[in-house]
């Protein structure tokens, strides 16, 4: 059984027991989160596709941890001007474990 849901402007295909990183959620570690923007639920041959959302569809997850991703370096370089600008960025994320899929 798997489902496709929307969170943080992105769509994720998940199944029970899977862990994934989402955009940062303002929820405490160990808390339960419910995602109700479910776009598709499939259980073997039984597939429910929403238009745009599946009615009564819900993905339940448990927050494992919060953290920051790998550093991305941003460099702006002007040729022949002896000028450059360097910056780094680390995006916050929330890691969740999928505990249930309801349709």
Curated annotation (Swiss-Prot):
UniProt superkingdom: Bacteria
MF annotations from Gene Ontology: rRNA binding; structural constituent of ribosome
GO CC entries: cytoplasm; ribonucleoprotein complex; ribosome
Pfam families: Ribosomal_L21p
Keywords, in A-Z order: Ribonucleoprotein, Ribosomal protein, RNA-binding, rRNA-binding
Disulfides per UniProt: none
Single Gene Ontology BP annotation: translation
Keyword Ribosomal protein: yes
Cited PANTHER family: 50S RIBOSOMAL PROTEIN L21, LARGE RIBOSOMAL SUBUNIT PROTEIN BL21M
Record family assignment: Belongs to the bacterial ribosomal protein bL21 family.
Subunit structure: Part of the 50S ribosomal subunit. Contacts protein L20.
Function statement: This protein binds to 23S rRNA in the presence of protein L20.
Protein's name in the database: Large ribosomal subunit protein bL21
Gene: rplU
């Amino acid at each position: 059984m798997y489902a496709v849901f929307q969170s943080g402007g992105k769509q994720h295909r998940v199944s029970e027991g899977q862990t994934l990183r989402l955009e940062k959620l303002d929820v405490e570690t160990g808390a339960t989160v419910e995602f109700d923007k479910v776009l598709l639920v499939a259980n073997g041959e039984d597939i429910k596709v929403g238009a745009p959302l599946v009615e009564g569809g819900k993905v339940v997850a448990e927050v494992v941890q919060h953290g920051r991703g790998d550093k991305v370096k941003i460099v702006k370089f002007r040729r022949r001007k002896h000028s450059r600008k360097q910056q780094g960025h680390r995006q916050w994320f929330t890691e969740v474990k999928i505990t249930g899929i309801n349709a």
